[in-house]
Regions:
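N-terminal export leaders
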Residues: 1-3
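N-terminal mature ectodomain segment of secretory-pathway/periplasmic proteins
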Residues: 7-11, 15-90
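Solvent-exposed helix/loop surface patches that form functional interfaces
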Residues: 8, 73-157
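Short hydrophobic alpha-helical segments that form membrane-spanning helices or hydrophobic packing faces
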Residues: 27, 157-158
Length: 158
């Protein structure tokens, strides 16, 4: 999969809760289609009256080569509590260390950083908040027409 053809150099989203913007999520791509780096950042803050009730900061850097995840470094801070996830390719497996321990998995495997279309065909993902291997069921739903600026296109819902 070539993220540069799909997204260019980056994709960015505003995050809303109850109609109010509470943060942002941005994913940046650098390198070449066969060997690239993906940096994802998300910052959320839910304010109640005069204080912040919930604060979430997330940063991940993933190295991809020839369509496979080679490494992943994630740091997360939720309400001041920090955690990390580290994954490295070793002997045709990915070794993952997270807050609940270590695990190993054979590729293909996808982290939950929400950009790689290949994840729709998988049933296990790397939870980038915990490092756990989570079982998932991704169901194909209907298509819908979306408009972005002056462009209109069909999008597949899952």
């Amino acid at each position: 999969m070539n993220p540069f053809e799909l997204y260019g150099g980056s994709i960015a989203f505003s995050v809303f809760r109850n109609g109010k913007k509470i943060g942002s999520h941005e994913v940046n791509f650098k390198g070449k289609p066969e060997n690239f780096t993906v940096k994802a950042e998300c910052r959320l803050a839910v304010n109640l009256l005069f204080f912040t009730a919930y604060k979430f900061e997330y940063s991940s850097v993933a190295q991809w080569s020839e369509g496979a995840l080679n490494s992943l470094d994630v740091s997360t801070t939720i309400n001041g509590i920090k955690s990390s996830v580290i994954a490295r390719s070793e002997n045709n497996e990915l070794s993952i260390t997270g807050k609940n321990g270590k695990s190993r998995v054979k590729p293909p495997i996808f982290p939950t950083d929400h950009w790689h279309f290949g994840v729709v065909n998988e049933n296990i993902v790397i939870n980038t908040l915990t490092g756990d291997l989570n079982k998932v069921v991704i169901l194909r739903k209907n298509q819908e027409r979306l408009t972005c600026g002056s462009r209109s296109f069909l999008a597949q819902r899952y």
